[in-house]
Amino acid sequence: MKILTQLIIAMLLINSTMAQTKKIIFVCDHGAGKSVVAASYFNKLAKERNLDYVAECRGTNPDSIVSLKTQEGLTKDDVYDAKIKPTKLQLSDTTNAERIILFTAAPQGINTKVKTENWSDIENVDAEYQKRRDAIIQKINSLLDTLEKH
């Protein structure tokens, strides 16, 4: 009976470890536009696919608030989370990240072994919100396809 109990405990521990939510970090200059759009849509689409991932947005030089165009666009899209505040990327953010997506150059001092992708080809979302949002969503869907296979 003792061995069976230990086996059950071991299986529960393995399952809880396997079920831990994995983190994706989206980084843009101000943490107020592209990274917010990306994290918002990543979380929505990952949830729809029942994937155990969560995204956070960060900035290398964060603004004090999410850009008004981003707030407006995400509100119209019904995915805006008013609790999001631009936050500076810290080394500790990258520690347990599964992947880091950069819309800007990686800041000095952030050296990580985490897989990093460069999405800097997407321009400012304030200029043409829908066009930029759609480009971000397309990249997110490709990323989710990749993550789904692992």
PLM region spans:
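Hydrophobic h-region of N-terminal signal peptides that target proteins for export
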Residues: 10-18
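Conserved active-site segments centered on acidic
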Residues: 19-90
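Phosphate-binding/catalytic loops
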Residues: 108-150
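A short, aliphatic-rich alpha-helical micro-motif
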Residues: 94-95
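Short, structurally constrained coil/turn elements
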Residues: 13, 49, 80, 110-112
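Sec-dependent signal peptide recognition
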Residues: 1-10
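Short, polar loop motifs at secondary-structure junctions
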Residues: 101-108
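Hydrophobic/aromatic beta-strand patches that form the interior of the parallel beta-sheet core
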Residues: 56, 98-101, 115-117
